[in-house]
Structures are given as structure tokens and as C-alpha cells.
């Protein structure tokens, strides 16, 4: 859509003008008026619609219905809806009258050439180029919204390339085009018009840094046909007059929304009049389309799994075999990162977060590489980035990161409704410190990136009481057949003490924790009686419980949860340098693969031949239709302050809900 253009007519000679189909042109009849004029008439050739707007308060009327009083408040509006076959093949005639004269005092003639120019794309998110009445200069959220969507072309479709597809100015393989959005320029009108008129495709300097445009200048089955015409350091392009009604362009995103970039990009096509050699060219018409760059989206543990990742290190063979068996039961692929690549860094959950980005025509999984940069640093880029698998990362400028910047400290809830607002893609959960305190927080560049995606608003929880400091140390989500469709699992020292007190009451106080642990180092067993008589341990767990309770209230408020949506999982913590670590393997730090749960084996007290902690967890989760598998991670993970979830990662199905249908 373009602003109205004003054309002035003259009594001395006919005037010529170019108009664009469907776009209103204002005709100024007041610049040259015969003396004595008090009335006028306006007529046009067939195909020219002329209206008179008497005032701002009154609706416009057709001009050819009567003679009009000459009043400078009147506005003459001309519209043509079909392109011309020849130059100046239509015209408008204005006759100036005096009430004292029978014949007109004078005539003014405006010759018109109509050209149809539109810049189109998928405006209504229905995977087609739409030419309807929506305002292409706007991007509207919601189920009734509209606007074009642009993917960040962050995968690597060409196997011989070392870089992401959007890192160069060429199309290396035709499959790369599937990650781009189509933009079509349509023009109809006399060819001779373009002897002294030019079409310029252009964007702003800021937007040129965020996207790249390729013009199809040859056979579409040849990569050489795709010429880079807009992008960094290139803000405008004169579209050559190639034979044909349509010119096709492919647009790729270069960066996700972030601080200083809300994700909105505009492209314009402008028709310039270059007919006067003595003056600079003048704009006649501009059409604009707006894209929103598709956000990076996280997937909660309640979505179906597609692929499980785990690292093979020197002492976790049994663990990997257990994860492999669980993946087989869940029907998903298993990818093992060998020790030669991980260099004994087993914390694959901390290294990356697997999400996706989506447009109507394409869904692309994207790995978000954390700034922790351990020995696994190269794995996401070297092994996951590839054909139809994108990559993104954020690094603080001063390279200052803390343990909170590992992605065990990055989770997302299932869809929720809280305080009357729907969050159909859930809410991102990150850990930080208490308001006003000076503890650890997630680095600003990661926070800015997550916040800018808009579709999964952040909730910050308190984790600085934990030695490692990750949200997955005290919470998890599992699917459920009722209620909200999920349950929030929270680690609970209180629930653990109640369980142990019950077992002590029934005469099992001498039952031991940590029996049967196999590893390089001997683990000292401890009885229920000893746990319940250890006042230091009890006091520290009261502190841990208070921290979890703080988070419980935040989660209830920000996710709209009730107590019936929360399950307390028995867990104890111990103090290490005044911070908390799991006393026995952290039960909520589990691998969720649909209905199959891979839970750290707690090595709890054996009562009547069964671990009472395992039995308690089964009694809480199996009524939800979940299958509990307890995996021994004690030596390779728990002794290093991590568990099953920390040592695995999962790529999941995208949400069925389309992000552009939500209202942030």
C-alpha cells in the first residue's frame, strides 16, 4: 500500500501522469483557474473512476453525477483498477464553468497511464502469496492476524560447506531455497513506460544487516540463477526489465530477534520517474511488505521425543546402555557422542538446548549452543548443524560466564494459562538469584536473546542456593492424562523426611542408604536413623525446602498452577561450601521420553526387598500411566554433581500450535 499522490493540472497544456492500479491519485484543480469560475465538471474515459469528496465529514461521491460548486475544500480522487495497454490511453477532463456563461470557461486535461505494481508474499500465513486487502505494512499477531514470516537460514544444506547457509552471498544448493521465503514482484503496463521509469527494490541499512534477498535471474533449477541483490552493505537494487509478468525473489533471515532487533523487517518497491534529464528522479509509488523473523522455540519435556543424545565416556558404559534401552522403548533415535569428540565432557544437557523455528512452509530444528564452552564446545556446530538442522549461539562479549549459563538451567513449561493470559507455547524457566541480591545470574546476552523471541516469556527462579545452580536440580515436568495435561515435579526434603519417619515408625530405622553402589570409590552407607538424627542435615534441608517453596509460589503464580498440579518427590540435599548438592541421586533430574521415565537410581533404604524411595516415586507417577526406569548414574554422574537429565538431551516434536496464532 502507498500514500496518495497529488497531480496538478494546467489550462495551458495537457498534463500526463502515471498512476498505479488500485491506488488513489489526488487531482489538484486549483492551481490554474479561469477568472469567474464558480462551478466545475469532471469526466473520465472508461476505466477511470472519479470521486469528489466534499468534506472530511461527508462520504465521497462519484464526480460524473452532477456539476460541482467550485470550493477549495473539495478533493478530486481518481482511481484506475486495470493497467493500460498504451501510454496515455486514458484521461480525465475538467471543465471550469461560470454561472453567468453557457459554455465552459476553459478545460484542463490529464492523460493517465496505469501500471499495476505489487510486491507480494505470504501475507496471511497460509503458505501462499496473498494480494488481499490486508495492510502489508503491518504485522499482526493472533488467529486472525496476518503478515509474512521469515526463517533464519541457519542450517547447512551443502555438505561440502563449512559454514551456515546464510554466511555467504550465494545459493549453494537448490534445497537451500526451502529455508527461504518467496517474495514476488508483479508488474503490468506498457513496456515503453519503463524507458524513463525505474523500479527500485530497497530496504533500510538496519534491515539490510538482518536479511539477504536473492533475485531469480535465470532457470530456477540452476544455483547460478540466484543473484544476491540485497543484504549487508547493499540496501537497494534496480530491478531490470526482464520479460515476464512476475519477478521472483527469495529472502533469507540472517539473525534471530534479539536486543535491539524486534524481528520486524521491511522491503519496498518504488517506481521512480526518470523522464526529466534536468532534475533528479521523483518517486511515484511505493509498495511495502513486512516480514517477522520466526523465533527460536523451546520444547517442553511433555512433547513426544524424536532423538536422544548421550555422551560415551570412560566409566558410563552401563549408563549409555540403559539410556539406549529406554530410547528403544520410547521408539526414538539414539545419538551417542563418542569420547574422542566429547573429551570426557559428559554434560550434554548443559552444552545445548534443542528447539526449532517455523514458517508456514517449513519447520527447522535448531540447536542453541550454550556459552559454557566445555570440552563439548564443538559438538553442536560440528555434529548437529547440517542438512535441515540449524544452529544459533550467544557469547558474552567479555567471555564471562558462570555455571548458570549452562542449559541445565534452561527449561520450558508446557502450555499454561496464568492470570487470565494464555501461553500456548509455555514459558521459559531460567535460574538466577533473589531480587535485589548480588548472586549469580544468566549472562545478559542469553537473557536478551530468550526475551526477544516473545512467544515463551521468561520466568526467573531462585537457584543461587544450589552449588551447580540449575533449575533441573529441583523441578521437572511429566505428561499426565488429566488436568492440565502435565504435572510439575518438585524436589521435596519435607516429603523425604516424612517418608523416612514413616519407615522408622514401622521399625525400619536401621535400613541403609547407598547399599549396592558400585564405583571407583567406596561410598559410606547411612541408616534412616542416622539421617533423622543428623540435626545439621535436617537444618540444611529446612533451608533447601524454604528455597524450593519460594520457587513453588513463583511457579504457581506465573504458570497458573494449583497444588493438584504439583507432585512432591522425596529428595534430600547436603551442604557443600554453603551451597546445596543432592544427598542421594536427584530423582527429579530425570529423562522424560513420553510415558517412559529414566530416573536416577537413588540407592535408598531397602525395605522388604525394595528401595523405599523407588517405591514412593512409582506410587506417585505410575497412576498417571508413566513407566519408571531407575538408571544407575551414581559414579559417572551423581558423584560429579549431575544426574540423568544432565547427561542426556532430547530433540522433540514441535508444538502443533503455530506461534503466529498467539498474542504475546
Curated annotation (Swiss-Prot):
Gene3D superfamilies: L-arginine/glycine Amidinotransferase, Chain A, Protein-arginine deiminase, central domain, Protein-arginine deiminase, N-terminal domain
Gene Ontology MF annotations: calcium ion binding; identical protein binding; protein-arginine deiminase activity
Major localization class: cytoplasm
EC number(s) recorded for this UniProt protein: 3.5.3.15
Enzyme class of the recorded protein, top EC level: hydrolase
Gene Ontology, cellular component aspect: cytoplasm; nucleus
Localization per record: Cytoplasm
Keywords: Calcium, Cytoplasm, Hydrolase
GO biological process: arginine deiminase pathway
Signal peptide span: none
Entries under InterPro entries matching the protein: Cupredoxin, PAD, PAD_C, PAD_central_sf, PAD_N, PAD_N_sf, Prot_Arg_deaminase_cen_dom
Family of this protein: Belongs to the protein arginine deiminase family.
PANTHER family membership: PEPTIDYLARGININE DEIMINASE, PROTEIN-ARGININE DEIMINASE TYPE-3
Protein role: Catalyzes the deimination of arginine residues of proteins.
Name of the protein: Protein-arginine deiminase type-3
Organism taxonomic ancestry: Eukaryota, Metazoa, Chordata, Craniata, Vertebrata
